[in-house]
Amino acid sequence: TTVKTANSGITFANGVIAAGQNLTIDSTGGPVSINSVMGSGTATSLTVNADSTDGGDNADTTETISIGAIGTANEIGAVTLDAADGITFTGDITLADAAGADLDIDGKVFISGNVTIDTDNTTGGGTDDGTINFSSTIDGVTEDPAVADNLVIHAGGAGGGSLTLSGNIGDGVALSSLKINATAGNLAFTVPQIGGGDAVGVTGNVDIGNAASGAITFSGTGTNALDVGGVLTVTGNGGATAFQFTGTNVEIRGDGGIAFVNGSGTDD
């Protein structure tokens, strides 16, 4: 099923889209707003494109997506979101236990409210973990009245699972809290710069990794390499290479405290 306009907005303001087959929503340059999308099968894919051209048009500022909850349990397979001017998440994203159930996010991301992104199925007894790919930055949203912008990421490392975080976190608007594989998952992954402009990237606590996590690499550089307003807790099980820093002149700040724990154990 395809819903398409020519550089005009598309809005599904209320209710839930029940996708019984692959769904493509393409505004070709207009803003897209979707309340929620659920599905009926592990192979059901969702593609939302707001770009007028491949990679976006610099002269067009309306290439945006705002989307709420996507999937629960085994309802939605692959999800691809393209919006050069920003993708705002307002709900949880849960992808199916199925090969190819990957999340591909092409555009800067804004977190509004509580958002959990989950492609870790093997922890719960499944067989396929999907990939999560952020192509750009991740920021909170300035709202009136203020809303806590909390991001939780569960990325599994089995069955082809992986996590890619390509841009700075909280460089524009800080998140309220951040958790990356804090409760489960044995994945090795890289964390980019958290913070920017001598300001924290997360105002509250940041929990990265767990006692089964593989090597965790931090790629940030300088005074905002890892800048947190609350407690920073990093846990891994990578042995001598559990925590690695690839940037230069790295400064780590946790106003509420800092803990790096090289743990051990299974994926729990």
Where in the sequence are the language-model features?
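Extracellular lectin-like interaction modules
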Residues: 1-268
